[in-house]
Amino acid sequence: MKNFIQIFTILVLFIIVSCAGSKGEGVSLQDRFNSGMGNLEKEKFLQAQSDFKYVVMRGTGSDLGDDAQYYLGEAFFRNKEYLLAVAEYEKLTRRMAFSPFVEDARFKICEAYRIESPKYYHDQEYTEKALERFQEFLDDFPNSNLNDEALVSIESLREKLGLKLYETGILYMKLDEFESAKMTFQTLIDMYYDTDMIQFAYQGMVKALARNKQIDEANAFLGKHKGRLVKSELYADAQKTIDKMKKVVSKDTN
């Protein structure tokens, strides 16, 4: 009798555990997806990530799985885990090219790199990646409603890269490395001609030429870009450097 009771108790416990397990396994992908959307709305991003990962793993190839892949990227993006978001968005864009979320995912990849772009004095890898992705976005989605926003971001990122080059040129000037300064200012002129840094590049080039004792070249360059330098109130400073170096050269030859 005692053994019977023990066996009966074990069977009852087994049935309870089995039922509990079946209930958990019985949660549908749609239920888990809905849970993820709810958690995303409530800004419970870690829980949302867990929900969407579950749906992605078990719903591969389904519309629900494709949607979950996008929202998994969203859960990372909204949690400011931008590089992880990029990885998830790229899974969507590579594997699910016909998803209605592809355009937004492509734009969010651009935005993620833009946000990760640091101050100009740091390495600009993410700035360059952002520019590349924004340009690809414009090429692939020429009629997108997001294009104006993309163009504004491109302009801002190009200004940053132009500023970095300008400050590099100024550093060379301080080190009396005038040939290197000239090369840097010329690169700025060639690559970032459409930014506000162009006027400072003109001024820097005049001063680099003058400090390098290339007075004729400095005068010629100043004359060529006089209008822009006068307008930006940088002409007088550039001319002052030429006049100063003229005296130095004259003194050296006497």
Language model features by range: what are they?
Residues F4-Q6, I15, C19-N254:
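Acidic, polar-rich low-complexity tracts and alpha-helical solenoid repeat scaffolds
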